[in-house]
Design a protein with these regions (language model features):
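Short alpha-helical donor nucleotide-sugar binding micro-motif in glycosyltransferases
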Residues: 270-271, 278-283
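A conserved mid-protein helix/loop that constitutes part of the nucleotide-sugar donor-binding site
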Residues: 33-37, 217-232, 249-252
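Conserved acidic donor-binding segment of nucleotide-sugar-dependent glycosyltransferases
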Residues: 324, 328-336, 344-349
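Short hydrophobic beta-strand element within catalytic cores of glycosyltransferases
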Residues: 308-312
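Aromatic "clamp/platform" in nucleotide-sugar-dependent glycosyltransferases that forms part
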Residues: 291
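Conserved donor-binding/catalytic core segment of Leloir-type glycosyltransferases
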Residues: 21, 201-221, 227-231
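A short, histidine- and acid-enriched strand-loop-helix "catalytic/donor-clamping" loop
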Residues: 129-148, 160-163
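Donor nucleotide-sugar binding/catalytic pocket of nucleotide-sugar-dependent glycosyltransferases
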Residues: 155-199, 205
Length: 387
């Protein structure tokens, strides 16, 4: 039994309908909100419970503090965890097999790909449990393009799945690549776990020109690229004020380079969710130079704070939100292009206002309610008439 888990968190209610079970790597702030909403809707539908089984209490590179679940039941599976990098983790939790046998779910949701998900998929096949596979991934970030073991794992998990769930058409393309019929894919958008407590402030009340928010690494988040863009703006005669929220291996390098250049830069380190509204509302422009985020909820956090975004095309949010809906600027990862684009956005208040208006039109489609509705649309055919 996982530490802190009660028997009621693990075993189904014998008097009620069989539960829905989600197997995931680790809880995140937005998935906690999602599962609370999904649990509420399932309970209201037919009294069905939602159980969430995590492979690890928390990813090592994350510092999120998660509130305890109120409406869904959560347990952490014992097993092996390899922290391969700041963004890559490998989970092997064979305990998922007896746990699923005890829970006897009416439907199973597998959140992404790992050996643990393969164990769960095998158990579901043996017990004829209908399975949904969910991924944030898009073709550009799919490791199956380059790795035969990754391709095999994904095909083994996706093959025969009842449906797929993801936040973008790109996620549907990834699942289709591994055998899911396209008509079985259902959109369930990603969304911020918080909403701004007040209307966004005007630009005149924002003390910083540029904001970076995320893990301070180069291989995924592009933190060194961000540094080069800031220094490039200075070389064009524009010493900008900068705020950096987050931590990681490049922090010392970034601090030193900005200090040597005589630039005003504030480094907050890691911040909890409660501090984020003030952070995002403190800058006139948010830079998201991602080199491979599967999505990028930080983009939506900036947009809902009235902060326009300049992003790379190498993320789900860059292509599936900013580019698709014209609510942000997307540029190739070329420093000179980003310097020019950033300065143009900072100098053109009407352009920033146009981007804000476009974001206001599209963000209502990227909410917790819309995400829950996507899950329910995928689950309803599986739960109809099932005890």
């Amino acid at each position: 039994m996982a530490a802190g888990a009660r028997p009621s968190d693990i075993l189904p209610d014998a008097s009620g309908p069989r539960p829905v079970v989600v197997v995931t790597g680790a809880l995140a702030p937005y998935t906690h909100v999602l599962y609370e909403g999904l649990a509420e809707r399932l309970a209201g539908r037919d009294g069905r419970a939602l159980h969430v089984l995590s492979c690890t209490p928390r990813e090592r590179a994350r510092q999120w503090v998660m509130p305890p679940p109120r409406l869904y039941r959560h347990a952490v599976l014992p097993g092996l965890r390899w922290h391969r990098s700041s963004i890559r983790n490998l989970y092997v939790n064979p305990a998922v097999v007896p746990r699923l046998a005890a829970l006897r779910p009416a439907a199973l949701v597998l959140n992404d790909f790992s050996p643990t998900m393969l164990f769960a998929r095998g158990a579901a096949r043996l017990r004829r449990i209908p399975t949904l596979v969910r991924t944030d991934g898009v073709p550009e970030t799919d490791p199956g393009q380059r790795s035969a073991p990754h391709r095999w794992l994904r095909r083994a998990i996706v093959s025969g799945a009842a449906a797929g769930i993801g936040p973008s058409a790109g996620s549907g393309a990834v699942l289709a690549r591994y055998g899911l019929p396209p008509e079985r894919f259902v959109l369930s958008p990603l969304f911020p776990a918080w909403t701004p407590p007040a209307p966004p402030p005007p630009d005149s009340a924002r003390p910083y020109d540029l904001l970076f928010c995320g893990m301070l690494n180069e291989e995924v988040k592009g933190a060194r690229f961000f540094t080069e863009v800031v220094l490039g703006c200075r070389d064009r005669g524009r010493p900008l004020s900068v705020r950096v929220a987050g931590d990681g291996p490049l922090r010392a390098e970034m601090e030193a380079r900005f200090a040597q250049a005589g630039l005003s830069a504030r480094f907050d380190g890691f911040l909890g969710q409660e501090a984020l509204p003030e952070v995002y509302a403190s800058a006139r422009l948010f830079l998201f130079p991602s080199r491979g985020d599967v999505w990028g909820i930080v983009v939506q956090e900036a947009l809902q704070s009235g902060t326009p975004v300049l992003a790379s095309p190498h993320s789900g949010a860059g292509r599936g939100l900013l580019e698709a809906h014209g609510c942000g600027a997307v540029r190739p990862m070329v420093v000179a292009d980003w310097v020019a684009a950033a300065l143009r956005l900072l100098d053109d208040g009407s352009l920033r206002e146009d981007l804000r208006r476009a974001a206001e039109r599209v963000l209502p489609h990227f909410t917790a309610e819309a995400a829950v509705a996507g899950y329910l649309a995928a689950l309803e055919p599986l739960l109809h008439g099932r005890p």
